[in-house]
Amino acid sequence: MKVQASVKVLCRSCKIIKRNNVVRVICSNDPKHKQRQG
């Protein structure tokens, strides 16, 4: 998982989700696209 200041959608299957006031990107297609803002 990458921790980045600004999370970006990298492909079509990436989804932006907000959990516990933390913005995350989850991707079912490519696990390398997982990101967390922080």
UniProtKB/Swiss-Prot annotation:
Q: Which UniProt keywords apply?
A: Ribonucleoprotein, Ribosomal protein
A Pfam family that the UniProt record links to this protein: Ribosomal_L36
* Superkingdom of the organism of origin: Bacteria
Extract the InterPro entries matched here: Ribosomal_bL36 (IPR000473), Ribosomal_bL36_sp (IPR035977)
**Carries keyword Kinase?**
no
- SUPFAM superfamilies referenced in this protein's UniProt entry, alphabetically: Ribosomal protein L36 (SSF57840)
Return one Gene Ontology term, BP aspect. Answer: translation
Gene Ontology molecular function: any one: structural constituent of ribosome
Q: Which family does it belong to?
A: Belongs to the bacterial ribosomal protein bL36 family.
Q: Specify the protein name.
A: Large ribosomal subunit protein bL36
Q: What is the species listed in this Swiss-Prot or TrEMBL entry?
A: Buchnera aphidicola subsp. Acyrthosiphon pisum (strain APS) (Acyrthosiphon pisum symbiotic bacterium)
